[in-house]
């Protein structure tokens, strides 16, 4: 499996480079975030051996267990890794997230952000966070409406133990490629409007977490700086019951 994961990662990097060339982007400005949901520690280590340092987890407890196992098995490696929570976050899980994760992509409420800031240990650098934008207005998904983003951005950016870095979005996976790219472009434009506010003049938002295995190129065309790839890195995984 280690060879297959390495081959997959090399293929994804080639795809990123090809998409960037097509749309005039610098591939060094697009981070591969390997989504390691349901992947065992051995698979994570295979990805690390292939050069990946950033991992995305959907479930808090599963992610923390991997971090602790890696810290015990490979202490020299674990410190170089960045762990991103890309799944929903409930209030009763904020402390463990604040204590272990480096990034949270799914901020959509001031209350959650306040708890993360209060519970982030002062010996750790501020937790890097993204606002989740419900760009297509789906009632089936989390995230805030684009019209509410500036107010939430101002509130979150004032919290001392958080650093607001940008926006995350997941449009309807059933949308066609043209519509998907349009929706991602709306998220990029929204970040641009937020950055026009004087509050963000010194530290403008710089991160767009957009795109997965099925729509990576559309996201890159629209300005993604971070693509969340699971199946393309680790292969098809069993559905959790």
Language-model-detected regions and their locations in the chain:
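Conserved alpha/beta-domain cores
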Residues: 1-214, 220-222, 234-236
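Gly/Pro- and small hydrophobic-enriched strand-loop and loop-to-helix capping segments
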Residues: 224-241
